[in-house]
């Protein structure tokens, strides 16, 4: 194992990062009235289209139907993505991030808990954004809204009153994400573990795709769902480490994850953080939405036909 990972794993074992980044439904319920605690619903829907691609839409209607008491809806595709980009879910500027989360009543010193009523990847994407801008205390509700409901906890409907706040002046940590040119350069240099977080089917080149089927040549397949239990809670730290070990992630100098548009790929990044690993890890933000459109950037298709 590369020493850069071993040092972080050793430190993580001493501080228990799972307690820092995950919260159970029962623990959240006991703290809902705590000063400085803000709960965000990141629900988004992603659906295959007839042309073989994908369409996405905010889950605001889901939020209006049911949400954790006091939670605010946070629009990943709208307020928390770069409106000037031709790609969905592109990282916003520091100013846009501060305005958007400030409008939800969040300040830089608040404790933020994020959940989704659909796939956890929407919550991990929002968690990653907060960490990208240096927010210190941000957690995921383990198991999402389904776990909250399974615990028999209270649900609200309708809109939640917003009280805007001044977030502050965050600094975007640009070493936490890369573009396609950086992938090409780092693959050529060596020492990179590139992880595809889409389904095995999509990795092979079957089913819906982002312009060209298949995966970036040289990347490993670790589907986002493989990091989770059946109830959508995160697997144990030992299981997560073994899962990443299986593709040789810790034998390389750097880990970069990608998917279709920078959403599912935040699940392995969050899983690494649960092990105490955040240094040397980056997200390919635009992922295959960018890569597949570049005809001379190498892709591999394992499916026949």
What kind of feature is each model-predicted range?
Residues 1-305:
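Cytosolic catalytic domains that perform sulfur/thiol-centered chemistry
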